[in-house]
Amino acid sequence: MLNSRFPVSVKKSHSLRERKVFTTILQSKTRFFGTFINAYFIKNNHSTWRVAISIAKTKYKLAVQRNLIKRQIRSIFQQISNNLEPWDILVIVNKGFIELTFKEKQKLFLQLLKRIKEVDAYQTSANK
């Protein structure tokens, strides 16, 4: 029986794995640079959002730390998934992210969501 406190894992349809898509996202001009995360994003042709999380081994040597960060980020994306349009998002985690509280991490990703919505509104108005 599933415990209702813990969300079910992110669906495979919401994860990015193709190298070709990674390079396309990195070459896009839409990005968000923060102290603890950098995010690149691009509109996709799918009906859902997709996310990839990149954590360098040089910044977080222990796999336990890297996995904790990935789980927290996936959980945050799952919480805000109702507000997400179909975007491909590449999140690059910087040093110091693990020291933040979960609420601070949520705040960071809400800022990212706000930035994505601003870019979406700008691109929509520019295409008209």
From Swiss-Prot:
Pfam families: Ribonuclease_P (PF00825)
Catalytically driven reaction(s): Endonucleolytic cleavage of RNA, removing 5'-extranucleotides from tRNA precursor
Keywords noted in UniProt: Endonuclease, Hydrolase, Nuclease, RNA-binding, tRNA processing
MF GO annotations: 3'-tRNA processing endoribonuclease activity; ribonuclease P activity; tRNA binding
Signal peptide limits: none
Enzyme Commission numbers on file: 3.1.26.5
Entry's Gene Ontology BP terms: tRNA 3'-end processing; tRNA 5'-leader removal
Enzyme superclass (EC): hydrolase
Any one Gene Ontology cellular component term annotated for this protein: ribonuclease P complex
InterPro entries according to UniProt: Ribosomal_Su5_D2-typ_SF, Ribsml_uS5_D2-typ_fold_subgr, RNase_P, RNase_P_CS
Domain of life: Bacteria
Family: Belongs to the RnpA family.
Subunit structure: Consists of a catalytic RNA component (M1 or rnpB) and a protein subunit.
Role, per record: RNaseP catalyzes the removal of the 5'-leader sequence from pre-tRNA to produce the mature 5'-terminus. It can also cleave other RNA substrates such as 4.5S RNA. The protein component plays an auxiliary but essential role in vivo by binding to the 5'-leader sequence and broadening the substrate specificity of the ribozyme.
Protein's name according to its UniProt entry: Ribonuclease P protein component
Organism of provenance: Mycoplasma genitalium (strain ATCC 33530 / DSM 19775 / NCTC 10195 / G37) (Mycoplasmoides genitalium)
